[in-house]
Amino acid sequence: DAGSRALVHAAAGGTGSLLCQWLAWHGVEVIGTVGSEAKVDVALAHGCTKVLVDADDDAAGLAAAVRAVGSGGGVQVAYDSIGRRTFSASLACLERRGLLVSFGNASGPPPPLDVLSLSTQGSLFVTRPTLFDYVATRAELLAATTRLFAAIRDGILRVPVHQRWPLRDAAEAHRALEARETTGASVLIP
């Protein structure tokens, strides 16, 4: 909702940069995390109002930094594509009745969750969406892609392709992704 705050991990990556743009277009204050100082400007250019460099495993420090941006109140929603390394920080930075959208495993799968802990942390919600639960039919797929391409056509979303590799260099592309050296989308060319 307009006026709310959201946390987006990997805000300079392919999915993160699109998500930041979409949220900002809807009037959401977007707090992004990136893996290095070199990625801060990329995240800002895609709609983040504040960018935090998260280069270590300090979950408590990251959660405190996110809460400080929101004057101590946390965020209403956290989008976590990283997984194991950021999952606890994502939960800890949510305000009461906040939502964690866990959709990636870049650092490994998220740890098991004690459901009872959600009540002690403020009646939190956690979801693990998969694409085909949202576009289960051809009609749903066409409707979703129509909205997506309209947003690109209308300039709401810019698709940043910052890396291109020949298909024969796929191993190098994977190495760069795993080393957190990329921004925006990465494309393999046959």
Question: Where would I find each of the regions flagged by the language model?
Answer:
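N-terminal Rossmann-like NAD(P) cofactor-binding module of classical short-chain dehydrogenase/reductase
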Residues: 7, 76-79, 101
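Glycine-rich phosphate-binding loop and adjacent beta-alpha segment
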Residues: 34, 85-156, 190
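NAD(P)H cofactor-binding loop motif with strongest signal on the N-terminal glycine-rich segment
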Residues: 10-11, 82
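Rossmann-fold NAD(P)-dependent oxidoreductase module
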Residues: 18-22
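C-terminal hydrophobic helical "lid"/dimerization subdomain
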Residues: 138-190
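Short helix-loop-beta connector
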Residues: 1-5, 72-73
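Hydrophobic/small residue at the entry helix of a nucleotide-binding pocket
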Residues: 14-15, 85
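Adenosine-nucleotide cofactor-binding segment
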Residues: 24-86, 137
